[in-house]
Amino acid sequence: MKRHNVRRLLALVLVAALCLLCGAAAQPNATEIHIYSADDLVQLSKSCKLDTYSQGKTVYLDNDVDLSGSDFVPIPTFGGMFEGQGHTVSGLELSGDASHMGLFRYVQAVSTVRDLKITGNIDAAGTLNEIGAVVGTNYGTI
């Protein structure tokens, strides 16, 4: 009877292990994010509302992206590696009374943003503190 229970337990453990392996193989690489379009950049901005979302991740800009007419808002906080790969983000339009304006509002100390071109307009009012095309407040490496 005990042998039978041990076999059942072993079988359950093996099935559980196989399920975990299949699930891990089906998921994309969670440490890489690829940006192909304005919609992808908008989604990145929404995801980066949580300050730890981008930490340990590398974001690749795989195409030139035109933000004209999109509902893009600056990426709130970024804590990973942003590889522009020589591509351009165009049509960046920022305006308002806020400070900390740029494609990224805050770049964390552990972050790097590189090989990126940006074109657009910034029309800021208020205190005009910490405003730039790439980042409003930078603690990382640009």
Q: Where are the model-predicted features located?
A:
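Bacterial N-terminal signal peptides that target proteins for export
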Residues: K2-V13
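Bacterial N-terminal signal peptides
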Residues: L12-L21
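Surface-exposed repetitive/solenoidal architectures
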Residues: Q27-I142
